[in-house]
Amino acid sequence: MSGRRVYSTSVTGSREIKSQQSEVTRILDGKRIQYQLVDISQDNALRDEMRALAGNPKATPPQIVNGDQYCGDYELFVEAVEQNTLQEFLKLA
């Protein structure tokens, strides 16, 4: 699978996950960075794919990848935004 993807879930009881997903998509949309939203709640294979790319069998959304390269999770994303290194984080530079 190619391109930037944000792994998310539409089914969660966690306000924290919902908030983190919203913030990631809001920032990407605001910077006009194209991405595909992948809803892992629709298929366990997608959840397994997300966890394999993250290298963490317990990884939870949101997780960001570019092609087959893992970019990071919410915390790393926010850190990149704060340090103005989002292009590098997303492996665009």
From Swiss-Prot:
Glutaredoxin domain span: 2-93
Localization: Cytoplasm, Cytosol; Cell projection, Ruffle membrane; Nucleus
Keywords annotated in UniProt: Acetylation, Cell membrane, Cell projection, Cytoplasm, Glycoprotein, Membrane, Nucleus
Cited CDD domains: GRX_SH3BGR
Residues modified by glycosylation: 2, 9, 12
UniProt modification remark: May be glycosylated.
Subunit relationships: Homodimer. Interacts with MYO1C (via its IQ motifs); the interaction is dependent on calcium and takes place at membrane ruffles.
Stated family: Belongs to the SH3BGR family.
Physiological role: Could act as a modulator of glutaredoxin biological activity. May play a role in cytoskeleton organization.
Protein name (Swiss-Prot/TrEMBL): SH3 domain-binding glutamic acid-rich-like protein 3
